[in-house]
Curated annotation (Swiss-Prot):
<keyword id="KW-0368">Histidine biosynthesis</keyword>
<comment type="similarity">
    <text>Belongs to the tetrahydrofolate dehydrogenase/cyclohydrolase family.</text>
</comment>
<dbReference type="InterPro" id="IPR046346">
    <property type="entry name" value="Aminoacid_DH-like_N_sf"/>
</dbReference>
<keyword id="KW-0521">NADP</keyword>
<dbReference type="GO" id="GO:0035999">
    <property type="term" value="P:tetrahydrofolate interconversion"/>
</dbReference>
<feature type="binding site">
    <location>
        <position position="190"/>
    </location>
    <ligand>
        <name>NADP(+)</name>
    </ligand>
</feature>
<comment type="function">
    <text>Catalyzes the oxidation of 5,10-methylenetetrahydrofolate to 5,10-methenyltetrahydrofolate and then the hydrolysis of 5,10-methenyltetrahydrofolate to 10-formyltetrahydrofolate.</text>
</comment>
<dbReference type="GO" id="GO:0006164">
    <property type="term" value="P:purine nucleotide biosynthetic process"/>
</dbReference>
<comment type="subunit">
    <text>Homodimer.</text>
</comment>
<keyword id="KW-0028">Amino-acid biosynthesis</keyword>
<keyword id="KW-0554">One-carbon metabolism</keyword>
<keyword id="KW-0486">Methionine biosynthesis</keyword>
<dbReference type="GO" id="GO:0005829">
    <property type="term" value="C:cytosol"/>
</dbReference>
<dbReference type="GO" id="GO:0004488">
    <property type="term" value="F:methylenetetrahydrofolate dehydrogenase (NADP+) activity"/>
</dbReference>
<dbReference type="GO" id="GO:0004477">
    <property type="term" value="F:methenyltetrahydrofolate cyclohydrolase activity"/>
</dbReference>
<dbReference type="InterPro" id="IPR036291">
    <property type="entry name" value="NAD(P)-bd_dom_sf"/>
</dbReference>
<dbReference type="InterPro" id="IPR020867">
    <property type="entry name" value="THF_DH/CycHdrlase_CS"/>
</dbReference>
Length: 278
């Protein structure tokens, strides 16, 4: 029987430390922590994430400028708003909720964010620095995943890691972070052949595909660490990519959904915000 990785507990431990950091920063008369949160349209998942961010920021004493924009906004208008925030000395971090409406150029807009305020690591420069192993803001969900893996009794260095999913937000950056930790990394996707055989070789298996209960015990190596990033709604209940109850019988460690990776994402955002002032 494996161990459930308690993301909520780890996130809470980190938040306690962050609260002290925020208090120290805010006690400095010249610096007050303030974050700008841009939401274009009314995507349900983004709205949920924004609410969680606001709740945590309020609890920690961080000011948030919520900028809610119509989904029909012109690209030039959005770029102007980002430029204003880049030049706003009060704002120490900017987060742009994704996905954006299809008429907006996501790459162009995320890259307009000042690299020193890009606390979700979305800009092309931030991505380039990540892949070169240089200091940068690391995307929040991938950073949270690495923090969770490091709580397990496994050496990332020298391990075989398999990442299912190649999104720019999770799959690609978490694969790069694992590579930076000297794991041997395989990225799988919808065109991958022999997926099950590849997964069975994984010491660390990260699934980020959004297919409910896709990963059964037949995909998991005995004693592996399994990180479930996927979220889907099934009969009004949030579930992950992994069949938790059967996989935990075979794996050494498994993250639940909810209560695993999701609990870490917002926490890593605030950690990035605080570290940006150092």
């Amino acid at each position: 029987m494996g161990i459930k990785i308690d993301g909520k507990r780890l996130a809470q431990d980190i938040r306690e430390e962050l609260k002290k950091q925020v208090e120290n920063i805010n006690n400095n008369e010249d610096v007050k922590l303030c974050m700008a949160n841009i939401l274009v349209g009314n995507d349900g998942g983004s709205q949920f994430y924004v609410r969680n961010q606001n709740k945590l920021c309020h609890a920690l004493g961080i000011k948030v400028k919520n900028i809610n924009l119509d989904e029909c906004i012109k690209e030039e208008e959005l770029l102007n708003i980002i430029n204003e925030l880049n030049n706003d000395n009060e704002v120490k971090g900017i987060i742009l909720q994704l996905p954006l409406p299809k008429h907006l150029d996501e790459s162009k807009i995320t890259s307009a964010i000042d690299i020193n305020k890009d606390i979700d690591g979305l800009s092309s420069i931030s991505v380039g620095k990540l892949y070169k192993g240089e200091k940068c803001f690391v995307p929040c969900t991938p950073r949270g995943i690495i923090e969770l893996i490091k709580t397990c009794d496994i050496d990332i260095e020298g391990s075989n890691a398999v990442v299912i999913g190649r999104s720019n937000i999770v799959g690609k950056p978490v694969a790069q972070l694992l590579l930076n930790e000297n794991a041997t990394v395989t990225i799988c996707h919808s065109k991958t052949k022999n997926l099950k055989e590849i997964c069975l070789n994984a010491d660390i298996l990260v699934s980020a595909i959004g297919k409910p209960h896709f990963i059964t015990k037949d995909y998991v190596k005995e004693g592996a660490v399994v990180i479930d990033v996927g979220t889907s709604s099934v009969n009004g209940k949030m579930v992950g990519d992994v069949c938790f109850d059967e996989v935990i019988e075979k794996a050494a460690y498994v993250t639940p959904v909810p209560g695993g990776v999701g609990a870490m994402t917002t926490t890593m955002l605030i950690k990035n915000l605080c570290e940006g002032l150092k």
